[in-house]
């Protein structure tokens, strides 16, 4: 079985948790996507922000991590859940 496109995999993962930041998303997807050249924090943050712009995710909060870097938490919206149910095969959910 193949892999979902990375952005779709991010949305699918967000459907399984109450909220997550980019590091948590990447840790969860690393077993499947960690060897990809594009498995980089800036790109995965872009995936999260793009899904937010499209109404599938929303910001759940923010704070500073232990390195004093900004950490943005996201959560899935009802539209995001509907998109997962409608467009992502049950095999991947």
Q: Which positions does each model-derived feature cover?
A:
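Short alpha-helical segments that sit at the start of domains
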Residues: 1-19, 92
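Short, Lys/Arg-rich nucleic-acid/phosphate-binding segment
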Residues: 61-72
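Short, amphipathic alpha-helical interaction segments positioned at domain boundaries
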Residues: 72-93
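General structural signal for alpha-helix termini and helix-helix connectors
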Residues: 12, 16, 31-35, 63
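Short, positively charged loop/turn segments that connect secondary-structure elements
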Residues: 31-45
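Short acidic, hydrophobic short linear motifs in intrinsically disordered regions
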Residues: 20-31
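A short, conserved structural fragment
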Residues: 52-63
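Short, hydrophobic-biased segments on the C-terminal half of alpha helices
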Residues: 45-52
